[in-house]
């Protein structure tokens, strides 16, 4: 077993270039199609393994209690799946990825935790071998274990490496939110009925986020505000973060200066690889 003390890992954000919701499965989940790419917006997790047999998690922001925390759940799933006993670790999470944004911050932290545990306890285990375990923690966790831009199907666990031409991204996050349950039960949700080929290039005319209609129907004023800024803003995941892609950084910088000061915003770059 490796002797690792206070090892730091970066935990990156993602965006969905599109998100199509398909049929409901017998297990209650929905099949989907999406294309993930990463952002250089990232959290930092520091793992200090020890012999205490205790799991301690701290952060620079208020975080969920252990039983509701995805990092803690990742540790317990790792223990159960690989029969690793008596894990002792202190984890410090420095959060930069906003929560409740659709950027996958919590899922990314969970995936980073699986990777740190693997590095310490089972270094022979590959990232790909951990994807089935990651899927048990949530639909977005597998892509962060995979670590490469990818086309995803199933509930997000069937992944095909697919690069996306690097761009700058302007992120906008309003202080509003819709629960996942509300999205799926909304009358404004129009699910996609046709599978599209993973061999397609990025085509905004047929690739969209099925959840956007729900968000716009509930918040029409924000919808209108976005369209006035630029009609190509898109929602990632279930929001509430929207992004605009461009190869022209100056264009996005100019637009950022026009954004209402009540909105959080970031100017970042897309990444095809995070490991």
UniProtKB/Swiss-Prot annotation:
InterPro entries hit by this protein: GHMP_kinase_C_dom, GHMP_kinase_C_sf, GHMP_kinase_N_dom, IspE, Ribosomal_Su5_D2-typ_SF, Ribsml_uS5_D2-typ_fold_subgr
Annotated EC: 2.7.1.148
Q: Does the keyword 4Fe-4S apply?
A: no
Q: What class of enzyme is it?
A: transferase
Reaction equation(s) it catalyzes: 4-CDP-2-C-methyl-D-erythritol + ATP = 4-CDP-2-C-methyl-D-erythritol 2-phosphate + ADP + H(+)
- Briefly, what is this protein's role? Catalyzes the phosphorylation of the position 2 hydroxy group of 4-diphosphocytidyl-2C-methyl-D-erythritol.
Q: What is this protein called?
A: 4-diphosphocytidyl-2-C-methyl-D-erythritol kinase
